[in-house]
């Protein structure tokens, strides 16, 4: 179970940056209004749906561990793209990839959590997984907001990508071995 909770924790702590910073990025960095912000989140949603449908195909050619690792790297690269972009098209591509990565990581780790424990503790294991996600969103979001306020949204997004790679990759290396 710990083999799935640690990657969930690492990914969500870093990935919470986009949830808190996108409402600021849309108007400040891209000059978008409410409809532009909605468009970026719609692209996230489209990416999530396509990502969900791609998981079975990915699992036919790669292990669950490799799928999660690839999606984690995709998220980090997508965040860097959003941070570096001054154009809506690039930010939309980044949010699309983020959506695909988000659902791939969380669905895969949730499935792994459920299948790694006996049936009599499955509900508790899923609950622990959900608590890890929610706790990281609750803790990570204000942390990324404070960093963005002290520096810049671009710096905070890039830092979250760096943190994801620094903390996430070692936890995923452990995950790959288990």
Positions of predicted regions on the chain:
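C-terminal transmembrane bundle of multi-pass solute transporters/carriers
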Residues: 7-15, 19-178
């Amino acid at each position: 179970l710990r083999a799935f909770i640690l990657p969930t924790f690492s990914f969500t702590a870093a990935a919470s940056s986009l949830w808190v910073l996108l409402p600021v990025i849309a108007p400040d960095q891209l000059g978008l209004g409410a409809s532009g912000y909605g468009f970026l989140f719609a692209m996230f949603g489209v990416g999530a749906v396509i990502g969900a449908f791609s998981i079975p195909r990915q699992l036919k050619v790669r292990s669950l561990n490799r799928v999660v690792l690839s999606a984690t790297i995709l998220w980090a690269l997508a965040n860097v793209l959003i941070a570096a972009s001054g154009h809506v098209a690039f930010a939309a591509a980044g949010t699309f990839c983020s959506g695909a990565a988000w659902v791939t990581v969380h669905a895969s780790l949730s499935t792994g959590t459920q299948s790694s424990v006996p049936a009599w503790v499955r509900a508790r294991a899923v609950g622990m997984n959900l608590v890890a996600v929610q706790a990281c969103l609750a803790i990570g979001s204000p942390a990324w907001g404070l960093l963005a306020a002290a520096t810049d949204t671009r710096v905070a997004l890039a830092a979250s990508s760096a943190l994801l790679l620094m903390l996430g990759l070692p936890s995923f290396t452990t995950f790959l071995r288990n």
